[in-house]
């Protein structure tokens, strides 16, 4: 569930809160109180040891028993105060570690603005019409003729394809005649589920692969921001 919380909300809560100064002050005061109680218990124990031999009678024994019970309470109280101080100290350390891991709100805003700017500018160039041919156009291999009713005319017009050059294009035309007739290009492959000559779909071009890498990088950045981990 914490991954669904916006990064800005967590960052604002951490950086705009009261910080750990009050917890640190409480830890110091509790440690001082624990030391004071422990010192009082030690002093009372020393006094009881000195008076134990001189006290006689039932009243003295009753007072000594009450003093021993009070001494036991002071010792337990001192240990409890010290444990509380240690718990507060661990909370302070956890807060400081979390503060180091959480990205500041200003940095998150700048990163998101940078991502929007990169998406809008489209540094990969995939959306610039000047760098792309219209859909359905085919760039044929120079010096090669294609019949109007041949395999190239049956390709899906939505898939912009490029005719792949074939090694040895100047070879004997009879060597390129098979059971299916003359083939302007060697081999067959599938383009959007339709058979055709050996053509390279636009999905295999370096420009498309660069676009895919760019969008993958953007998704990784957004995931990193959601995880709220500051790079060290």
UniProtKB/Swiss-Prot annotation:
InterPro entries xref list: PPE_dom, PPE_sf
UniProt region (Disordered), positions on chain: 123-147, 169-200
GO biological process: response to host immune response
Record's GO cellular component terms: plasma membrane
SUPFAM superfamilies named in the record: PE/PPE dimer-like (SSF140459)
Coiled-coil ranges (or none): none
Pfam families in alphabetical order: PPE
PANTHER family in the record: GLUTAMINE-RICH PROTEIN 2
Homology family: Belongs to the mycobacterial PPE family.
Protein name: Uncharacterized PPE family protein PPE58
